[in-house]
């Protein structure tokens, strides 16, 4: 089995976006481009469903795993109409898992990577489940043994929970005709240069669409400078809990 990983991440000091492009195969992998036809996509933060295109690049019949605390009924209200429509039209296998709740239950708090990784191997079926479980537990033991048996046991529990705790959503037929009610509200303000920069460049970049910007979008910034004050327009709302 061969594997290839490419990780695209932003420059945020913490809480930034990371997109992992992973390929697996029985022959050497020499692809040098982002994945645009995926068999599996996972979203680890529920707030991302309103911020990024999550399922557009999934293949027909692919799998989508969403980490969220929502019930099937709540998904109806929480998911954008465009996402629901694509899930239904492409016959996507849609799964949810509450990784945050699992992390709190076993003592790992917001550290959910192990939980989601275990769910990935179970759903994707790249290697037999028992092999995946063994490899992950062996790796956890090697990585955390110096921190004590309790930490190792928590990570082993996270692996078991990730494999058994995801839920397959019964996608309603009505999602095929779901309407996209997303409204793009342009930035406003007293400084025209900041507003122009935010609407033309910052918002597409923050939506992970920067590679689609035309050269003309940068006509007012040919020297690479950006106006000060744009941080006031960037309230990401990615926190799991708000005090």
Where do the protein language model's features map onto the residues?
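Ferredoxin-type iron-sulfur electron-transfer modules and their immediate structural context
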Residues: 132, 148-243
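Short alpha-helices
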Residues: 78-143
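Redox-cofactor binding/interface segments in oxidoreductases and associated redox assembly factors
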Residues: 43, 65-66, 117
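Glycine-rich phosphate-binding loop
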Residues: 28-60
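Anionic-ligand anchoring segments at beta-strand to alpha-helix junctions in alpha/beta enzyme folds, i.e.
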Residues: 1-41
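ADP-ribose/adenylate-binding Rossmann-like module
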Residues: 55-94
